[in-house]
Amino acid sequence: MRQGSIVHKTLEDQVHTMVEVEVLTKEDAWGLRIWNIIQGLKTLRDTGMTREMEVWGVVDGLVVNGVLDELSYICPDRELEKATAKSNKDTPSADQTSITNFLDQDSGVIKNLRDIIEKTSRIYLTDVKTRGAKSIPKGASFRPTLMQLMLYHRLLSDLATNKVDSIIIFNRYDLDPAAPFSDSFIAQIGNLNEVFVDASTDPKQDPDIPSPAQDSMQILLEHNSLQSLWSLMILEFKRTMPAGVKSIGNVLKAEYRGQVDGAILGIKTFLYDNKVMQTYLDDEMRWWKGEREAQGVCMEEAYKCGFCEFADECSWRKDRIEEATVAHRARTRSVV
């Protein structure tokens, strides 16, 4: 776990500069989390990539959160996307320009990032997993990662389309959305002197979106509460993903890296499937709300029972043992 965290931290440091900020209140702490998302979206627009961006959502009345390991404008599997384009009108057209077409072949330097963003317009999710083993998971072992990435896609889509009720989030964590941030917090963020500059967006398009001349101090003073800062965050989502859900690519990527050296072990790509995701969520929520019994793992993953802390009291496991015993006795009697 610790080695995996080091790998994630190394990747994050490639994109972001970490600055320590002291918080005095719960609202300050959450304000910092929202501020980091705003900065993450700005980084995505400016550089074409951001990492370790937190997202929140509400699933069947329950608050769910996660951290997106990577967002970028680079499609992880162009062939998969092209294949689905033939049967799905909402996928990119065949003449859509690839980000690689804007790379200088000799130096690999992006020539015109703004042109890339305008032409590709889609953002793709990547989840990074670290492993001690040199192999990557297959079959049932891959399912948790598949569902996790699809859930992150859903959470990001809901934020991009302003479907998340912030009051539910704030109530869940006992936060006062109208409470002003502490002077210390505003001063620290203001001293970072982060200027909101985005040449591709005309500030006249929306008076609520920060103009290029606004710095961190001015922005926080104008959005001096969680509710106000949340509204600014939603505007930044709108700015980054103007087409809403269609701004988010359906090709998802799971990247596996070694725990020790961070070397890439393998990559899996797949498509977001809303029906599969909804079926999974409905079933999980039924268990979470006590509307169904817990279900055990499939035979392929029965090895997990060996280190499960609930193994000794697991009724599902005991039932499977009883079923196997009865079946064995029946076979023995039939042979005799």
Language-model features: locations:
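Mg2+/Mn2+-dependent nuclease catalytic core
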Residues: 56-283
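Nuclease catalytic cores
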Residues: 1-56, 61, 65-66, 282-288, ...
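Sparse, context-dependent recognition of short Cys/His-centered cofactor- or disulfide-binding micro-motifs
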Residues: 34-36, 40, 55, 108-113, ...
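Flexible, active-site-adjacent loop/turn segments at secondary-structure boundaries
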Residues: 149, 295, 303
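Surface-exposed helix-capping loop/turn segments at secondary-structure junctions
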Residues: 18-23, 161-168, 289-299
